[in-house]
Amino acid sequence: MESTMGAESQDDFEGLFDDMQLDSTKLGRTVKDRSLVMSKIIATLADITLNVDDTKIDILGNAYEYLIGMFAANAGKKAGEFYTPAGPAELLSMIACDGLTDVQDAADPCAGSGSLLLRVGNHANVRRYWGQELTSQTYNLCRMNLILRGIKYQNFQIFNGDTLAEDNFGDRPTVFCKYS
């Protein structure tokens, strides 16, 4: 496994797993229990053959989005802070991309988990994804979601901050979809 330390991508991966709580009692009461759970998860993931180059089905990305959706459903009202359900996300992306095959920039000022941005990418060839998200946990979810879906770090820029108080887009795209 390669490190991003000193690489061009270092800033893009900085803090990606900061919100992971491996000491949470939800994983087990003791350190030994938590270690066993994490070992089983890692071993299970290592045993899965994911040859994403040979298939159009994004197994890991779909599983990740499914888990985000399940978490959102169980989170109740708070879920609206980070997850746009599949139906509305699909409709919005279809409307935004109507008649487009290439999109220079797709931007979401309240990116959440990034599912809406990714849906736009299902309807048009998006060159660059932009987003901003207020909460650090959801900001990291968004970045992980884009990475797991095969979006190269050079092709997205997600900011962590309050879009209304501090718009990090500046002179960057501020529309949802920009025609190429």
Where are the predicted features?
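Non-catalytic, mostly N-terminal accessory regions of nucleic-acid modification and defense proteins
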Residues: 1-96, 157-163
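Conserved S-adenosyl-L-methionine
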Residues: 78-177
